[in-house]
Design a protein with these regions (language model features):
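Conserved ASCE/P-loop NTPase catalytic core
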Residues: 1-140
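Short amphipathic alpha-helical interface segments
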Residues: 257-263
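Proline-rich intrinsically disordered, low-complexity coils
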Residues: 6, 26, 43, 64, ...
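Weak global preference for isoleucine
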Residues: 27, 57-59, 65, 76, ...
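Short alpha-helical "patches" and their helix-cap loops
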Residues: 2-14, 241-257
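Phosphate-sensing "switch" segment of ASCE/P-loop ATPases
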Residues: 99-102, 118-253
Length: 263
C-alpha cells in the first residue's frame, strides 16, 4: 500500500505510530542486497526477508529507491514483486543459492513527486494499491505536534504505544473475525478492478511521443482480490459483520480511483 501526500501532511507521523511494535519492521535504507544477500561470509538467512515474515513492513520514504540507478532499482522491485507472491529464489556468482517463502504486509510513503516515476511501478505489476492522503489545516496541526513542543518525545512514545496496541489487538481479531462480502459487492468490486487495471496500464512512448509497443493491461484479478481484502479489513476495523456498500466499499473505491495515474 502506497500512501501519497504533500510534505508535512502527516505521512511520517502516521507510520511512526507503528514502528514500536514487534509486529512491524521499519526500513530506512534499501540496497539491492537488503532483502537477500549473496555474501558467503554471512549466514544464509541474513537477509531482511527472513525477519519480515508475518510483519508489517514500513518504508517511510520511497524517494531513495526511486532515485536509484535503473539496475539497482529494478533488482529491488523484482525482489519485492517475488516476495509479494510468497517466494523468492536467488543465485549469486559467489555460489550461494537462497530461497525464501512467507508473507508480509507493506506500507510505503511518498510525496506527489512519485507521479514522475509512475511508470517505474509498472515493474511491480499489479501488486500495489495507492491512497492519496487528504489533509486539512486541522490535521496538519495535529500531526505537527510531533515536530514541536516540549513534550515531543512523550507524544511520540504515546503514539507508538497506541500503534503497538492497535496491531496487537487486530492481529487476534483477524484470526477470529470473517466479515461477509455480499455477492453483488464482489461483482461490483470485480468490475471496478478490471476497469482500474486498464486505466492504470502504462503506455510506452518514444522521444517523439509515438506509442511503441501496444499496451498490455493487467487482467485485474489480483487487483480485485486486493480491493476485496481492503474492504474486508475495514469491516474488521469497524467491527462490522459484513462489507457494506456505503461503508467499507467506499474505502475500496477510493483506493481504486487513487491508483489511476493523472499524467
Amino acid at each position: 500500500l502506497l500512501l501519497v501526500g504533500p510534505s508535512g501532511g502527516g505521512k511520517t507521523a502516521l507510520l511512526n505510530m507503528f514502528t514500536g511494535s514487534e509486529l512491524s519492521e521499519p526500513i530506512s535504507k534499501f540496497t539491492k542486497n537488503t532483502l537477500l544477500s549473496g555474501d558467503m561470509n554471512l549466514p544464509s538467512n541474513s537477509g531482511l526477508l527472513f525477519q519480515m515474515n508475518d510483519k508489517l513492513i514500513i518504508i517511510k520514504d520511497l524517494a531513495p529507491i526511486l532515485e536509484m540507478g535503473k539496475e539497482h532499482r529494478g533488482e529491488i522491485l523484482s525482489d519485492l514483486r517475488d516476495a509479494y507472491d510468497g517466494l523468492v529464489s536467488k543465485s549469486w556468482g559467489t555460489g550461494r543459492n537462497t530461497r525464501w517463502e512467507g508473507k508480509f504486509g507493506l506500507i510505503g510513503a511518498a510525496t506527489n513527486a512519485i507521479d514522475r516515476h509512475w511508470k517505474v511501478f509498472s515493474e511491480l505489476g499489479e501488486r500495489f494499491l495507492r491512497v492519496n492522503l487528504k489533509t486539512d489545516s486541522k490535521a496538519q496541526t495535529a500531526f505537527a505536534i510531533e515536530q514541536v513542543g516540549s513534550e515531543e518525545e512523550e507524544v511520540k512514545a504515546s503514539l507508538r504505544r497506541v500503534g503497538s496496541e492497535f496491531l496487537d489487538h487486530y492481529k487476534e481479531a483477524v484470526s477470529t473475525t470473517h466479515p461477509f462480502v455480499p455477492d453483488y459487492l464482489k461483482s461490483t468490486i470485480s468490475e471496478l478492478g478490471i476497469l482500474v487495471a486498464r486505466l492504470r496500464t502504462p503506455v510506452q512512448r518514444d522521444r517523439s511521443k509515438h506509442v511503441g509497443t501496444p499496451p498490455q493491461p493487467e487482467v485485474g484479478t489480483r487487483l480485485t482480490k486486493q480491493l476485496i481484502k481492503l474492504a474486508t479489513a475495514a469491516a474488521v476495523l469497524y467491527e462490522s459483520p459484513s462489507v457494506t456498500k456505503y461503508g467499507e466499499y467506499r474505502l475500496a473505491l477510493r483506493a481504486a480511483l487513487d491508483c489511476i495515474p493523472t499524467n
